[in-house]
Amino acid sequence: MNHLIIFAHPNSQKSFGRAIVDRVVKASQQLGVETHLRDLYTMEFNPIISFEELQSASKGIIPAEIQQEHDFIRQADLITMVYPLWWMGFPAMLKGYLDRVLSHGFAYKTENGESKGLLQGKAMQQFITIGSSVAKYQEYGVDKSLNHCLINGLFNYCGIENVDYTLFGDIHIIDDAARQAMLDEAAEKTTAKLTALLAQS
């Protein structure tokens, strides 16, 4: 069993997102699962895709650093993403990572004029921090838009059908007890997800 964690936050060591990552890693390792963390800011990942790279990807020519990310994703049974929601979307670092890594021929292909996802058989969970309340986001339908476009929409397109996500809201104003409850929830969901996958393997 292989678990890949993709983390994007510029305050990569002291943010609440990092605390989530640490709990997810611990829960995974306690089950004896091989666990890999890709901390995009600490890695200084280059999120900018060039036109040359875009053209080359369609010909199967992939930069070495992207091939490495392909290997991590290819081997993963569970992919966990941890990131803040900024301007109703991914941080630019994570968006650029996905632009470069979910390349044609790896994440999807084209057959008879239609796209087909190539990442079947993988599960995904996302833990997303937001500055406002979850209830307010739900009131305006933001959660549904995120789900349709950036969460299930994007990853279903690439063949990942088993996608769960959790919004953690008001992270700048809640107290330590509330934060601890969120961390416990992230750990419990990770344990449950991996336990179910282990039972199927």
Set out the residue ranges of the language-model regions:
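N-terminal beta1-alpha1-beta2 submodule of the flavodoxin-like/Rossmannoid cofactor-binding fold
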Residues: 1-106, 173, 177-201
